[in-house]
């Protein structure tokens, strides 16, 4: 890359090894790199609880930027994160859904407001340490989201709702690397502290993974006991609030039924948790809405794909069928598609994303509504 071709890129630096190496690799490739860390921890909450945006993480990101010789800034995104991610997360659980806050954060925060800030700074690209790959057709200009070399770390599921414009201004420097190689490369470059940091496993704003206590603290008046019922409406016992349960759950129900019972779903209006036996947890179909298409402009007729119903779920053969005049269906956000699986899937969970693949490419995805 010549100086006249030098591009400016903003790297979202979380203080972890992946984003640190994303910045390092881009600088080595000749980009003008600016490191930015988003401060998103809830206002009034503890600032240093070990999450990706804690004071410790910000200090780690600043230290890495200094070692790399790049500028580093911290942007206060607390309000936008609180209103668009934490409120969404809380309200979804209170509505009987099991949300995925990372997909909402990527849509609204990282590739929404953060990308706009990066562009306002004159950056050509936004880069992150995600394990994913962006490809572009040189003739049509269409961008594609593809699985990375390290398929175990594949994060394309979390990125299915990126638009064409967002993908055109996105770089994923780790696309062709294995995670263990990234750690080795970080150590070789003297980034010893971040090279040894463990992978984050929990939701970033709930480091102890106790989402029930988190929601209870924010909305105690909305969590009320109610009845466990079967599909016929027969009362089986009492539950301690809808947020304590998710589809497919068996343990922690707090009631003995004489046989294994599993959560099948919720009657939110009646504040009821619907239970059934294991075989009832499986289903061949789901409905999805709030759709985003990447590899194609849209779906006009049946389309055969592989589908993933949660982040670490295996890919499953399926057919997408668009439903006509579906915008008025309960829970619809725009058009709705029916997804028919070749084999039944366990615990299809409203609120989660379903993401569609063909080969290595992400076709698109949407939010499961039933």
Swiss-Prot record:
InterPro entries: MnmA-like (IPR004506), MnmA-like_C (IPR046885), MnmA-like_central (IPR046884), MnmA-like_central_sf (IPR023382), Rossmann-like_a/b/a_fold (IPR014729). GO terms for cellular component: cytoplasm. The record marks 130, 352 as: Interaction with tRNA. It is found in: Cytoplasm. It comes from the Bacteria. One of its GO terms (biological process) is tRNA wobble position uridine thiolation. ATP binds at residues 12-19, 38, 129. Its EC number is 2.8.1.13. One of its GO terms (molecular function) is ATP binding. Disulfide bonds join 105-204. Pfam families: tRNA_Me_trans, tRNA_Me_trans_C, tRNA_Me_trans_M. Residues 153-155, 310-311 are annotated as: Interaction with tRNA. The active site is at 105 (nucleophile), 204 (cysteine persulfide intermediate). Keywords: ATP-binding, Cytoplasm, Disulfide bond, Nucleotide-binding, RNA-binding, Transferase, tRNA processing, tRNA-binding. It catalyses: S-sulfanyl-L-cysteinyl-[protein] + uridine(34) in tRNA + AH2 + ATP = 2-thiouridine(34) in tRNA + L-cysteinyl-[protein] + A + AMP + diphosphate + H(+). Catalyzes the 2-thiolation of uridine at the wobble position (U34) of tRNA, leading to the formation of s(2)U34. Belongs to the MnmA/TRMU family. This is tRNA-specific 2-thiouridylase MnmA. It comes from Desulfitobacterium hafniense (strain Y51).
């Amino acid at each position: 890359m010549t100086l006249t071709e030098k591009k400016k890129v903003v790297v979202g630096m979380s203080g972890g090894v992946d984003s640190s190496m994303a910045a390092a690799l881009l600088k080595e490739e000749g980009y003008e790199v600016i490191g930015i860390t988003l401060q998103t921890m809830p206002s009034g909450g503890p600032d240093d609880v070990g999450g990706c945006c804690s004071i410790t993480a910000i200090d780690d990101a600043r230290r890495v930027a200094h070692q790399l010789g790049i500028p580093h800034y911290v942007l206060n995104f607390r309000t936008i994160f609180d209103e668009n991610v934490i409120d969404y997360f809380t309200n979804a659980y209170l509505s009987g859904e099991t949300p995925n806050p990372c997909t909402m954060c990527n849509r609204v925060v990282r590739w929404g407001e953060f990308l706009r800030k990066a562009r306002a700074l004159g950056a050509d690209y936004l880069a992150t340490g995600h394990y994913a790959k962006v490809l572009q057709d040189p003739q049509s200009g269409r961008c594609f989201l593809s699985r990375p070399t390290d398929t175990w770390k594949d994060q394309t599921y979390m990125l299915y709702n990126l638009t064409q414009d967002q993908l055109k201004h996105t770089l994923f420097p780790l696309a062709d690397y294995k995670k263990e190689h990234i750690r080795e490369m970080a150590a070789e470059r003297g980034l010893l502290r971040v090279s040894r940091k463990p992978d984050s496993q929990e939701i970033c704003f709930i480091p102890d993974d106790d989402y029930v206590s988190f929601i209870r603290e924010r909305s105690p008046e909305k969590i009320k006991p109610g009845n466990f019922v079967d599909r016929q409406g027969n009362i089986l016992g009492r539950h301690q609030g809808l947020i304590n349960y998710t589809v497919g759950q068996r343990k922690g129900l707090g009631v003995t039924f004489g046989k294994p019972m599993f959560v099948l779903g919720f009657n939110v209006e009646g504040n009821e948790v619907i239970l059934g036996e294991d075989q009832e947890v499986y289903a061949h179909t789901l409905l999805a809405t709030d759709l985003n298409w990447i590899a194609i402009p849209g779906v006009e007729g049946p389309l055969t794909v592989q589908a993933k119903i949660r982040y670490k779920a295996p890919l499953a053969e399926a057919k997408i069928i668009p439903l006509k005049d579906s915008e008025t269906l309960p829970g619809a956000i725009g058009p709705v598609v029916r997804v028919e699986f070749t084999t039944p899937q366990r615990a299809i969970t409203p609120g989660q994303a379903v993401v569609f693949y063909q080969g290595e490419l992400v076709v698109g995805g949407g939010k499961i509504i039933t």
